[in-house]
Design a protein with these regions (language model features):
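N-terminal alpha-helical interaction modules that lie
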Residues: 9-38
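Short, Lys/Arg-enriched N-terminal segments with co-localized hydrophobic residues
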Residues: 1-10
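Charge-rich, low-complexity segments
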Residues: 116-187, 193-196, 203-434, 443-450, ...
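Alpha-helical adaptor scaffolds
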Residues: 23, 35-91
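TPR/TPR-like alpha-solenoid helical repeat scaffolds
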Residues: 52-55, 87-93, 112-127
């Protein structure tokens, strides 16, 4: 009857309230006893999930997994089910499997703080350093097949080749972009993602000796002076027929680029702009484009002083050298100084007055409470961190002594730990009114901590 159905719903609500009350009080055994008292045949999806949660909370992760597997068909599109699967696998040290479930939970219910934190912790426990080594092991194991793909390209379906190679680059992270070409060239692509300029060079650095004489790996597209034709948006565009002008700003040390090509300029503005940027990156290379091109706009006619796109790379390099500037294509090689007004704030870094960095966007995000770059780096198993130590700011002379100590310690960490063991990069440092800071990008957090703690213990005064 309808009254019986209503009574069952009320009883279910009372049951849920009781279970939630016990869970909040950490009385998970009571939850287990109650739900185990219901026969499996009568336990629904929700009751089974709550029982699995209780087993997770008492550390019986294998039992939780068995229960969750029994409701997989319904659970795969459920946030809680995916979270609980990830939770059990995480505490069984099965981090890669756990990561896939937490990632799915995040897709289903974005921005849950617990899910995001578990994703971060999973990534840290699958460090970039070990991912890189796994990729190279895969590449060496499959080198013969990869060579055949280069030598007999016409015999391979491109989609099949891409899927095969994605098995290897997928060991590094999801959505790694690459291109494999003639002459055994393998090029990773940063696709405008700044953090990859700091990660991919290490990937190339770890290439096994057995591959070095034959294969040519690039951390990002290096550019070319050779012209070619590109099919895009139904157009066949010859690079020689794309005309450009580059105006140099010596204060900013960058270029504003304008372009004209009849077909490109007939496209809607967003399409034309996007198509040109693809061409420019291919010709200039991703490093030069990212470092030195600050603005791109199209013109409605061929203007005086314009020249063919293939000559742009040479023009930029010559202009920089003529102005006494060193040509540095990777942003990680360029350090800049910055000054800030110290703030009254108990949180670290808000006391900073002056610093230097080769990753300005990351430093900015520290103060914006923005984790975008932090999470993008974490996605690869790397970690942006800073070490801080307090000091007594009693005089300018004492501050100089502290600054000299920071420089010496940075040098020591870089030479003895980062360079020797390939554990990361020094990104810069800063001094504030209360603390000193050293910024790092780590390729293996656990490995770094194990090495750096004995060094830091040598300086008990800090």
């Amino acid at each position: 009857s309808i009254s019986n159905k209503i009574e069952n719903i009320i009883m279910d609500d009372k049951l849920k309230q009781q279970i939630n009350s016990w869970t909040k009080a950490n009385e998970d055994r009571k939850v287990i006893d109650l739900l185990e008292g219901i026969s499996p045949a009568e336990r629904g999806f929700e009751e089974t999930g709550l029982l699995a949660r209780a087993y997770n909370y008492v550390g019986e992760y294998e039992k939780a997994l068995v229960l969750l597997e029994s409701i997989r068909e319904v659970g795969e599109q459920d946030t809680n089910w995916n979270f609980r699967m990830g939770y059990a696998l995480y505490y069984l040290d099965r981090y890669k499997e756990a990561l896939s479930y937490f990632t799915k939970a995040d897709e289903l219910t974005p921005e849950d703080v617990d899910t995001i934190e578990f994703i971060r912790q999973c990534n840290i426990r699958i460090p970039f350093k070990s991912r890189v080594d796994a990729f190279w092991a895969w590449f060496v194991q499959n080198e013969a097949e990869l060579s055949r793909m280069v030598e007999k390209r016409g015999e391979y379906d491109s989609e099949t080749s891409i899927r095969f190679i994605e098995q290897g680059v997928g060991l590094i992270a999801k959505n790694v972009h690459f291109n494999i070409g003639g002459n055994y060239e393998f090029t990773f692509s940063v696709e405008g993602e700044a953090h990859l300029f700091y990660l991919y060079p290490y990937l190339i650095y770890r290439m096994p000796e057995s591959l070095r004489d034959k294969w040519h790996f690039f951390p990002y597209n290096p550019g070319t002076d050779c012209s070619f034709e590109l099919k895009i948006y139904g157009l066949d565009i010859n690079m020689e027929e794309v005309y450009v002008c580059a105006k140099y700003d010596d204060k900013r040390n960058d270029f504003a680029v304008s372009f004209y090509e009849k077909g490109l300029c007939s496209l809607p503005e967003n399409q034309g702009h996007g198509a040109f940027c693809i061409m420019m990156e291919i010709m200039l290379g991703e490093g030069l484009s990212y470092r030195y091109v600050s603005k791109v706009e199209r013109t409605d006619r061929l203007e005086e002083g314009m020249f063919p796109l293939p000559a742009l790379r040479g023009y930029i390099v010559k202009t920089l050298k003529d102005n006494g500037k060193e040509v540095l294509e990777n942003p990680k090689d360029v350090f800049v100084s910055y000054q800030l007004d110290p703030e009254e704030n108990d949180e670290l870094r808000y006391d900073v007055a002056i610093g230097s960095t080769n990753f300005s966007n990351l430093v900015s995000q520290y103060y914006e409470n923005n984790t975008t770059l932090f999470d993008k780096i974490n996605h690869y198993g790397a970690q942006a961190v800073f070490l801080a130590f307090p000091y007594n700011n009693i005089s300018a002379e004492h501050q100089k002594t502290i600054l000299d100590f920071r420089y010496a310690l940075e040098d020591r960490i870089e030479k003895e730990i980062l360079d020797t063991d390939g554990l990361g990069l020094l990104l810069g440092g800063a001094i504030g009114t209360c603390c000193c800071y050293m910024d790092f990008l780590l390729y293996d957090v656990k490995g770094f901590i194990e090495k750096v703690l004995p060094v830091l213990r040598e300086y008990p005064q800090y």
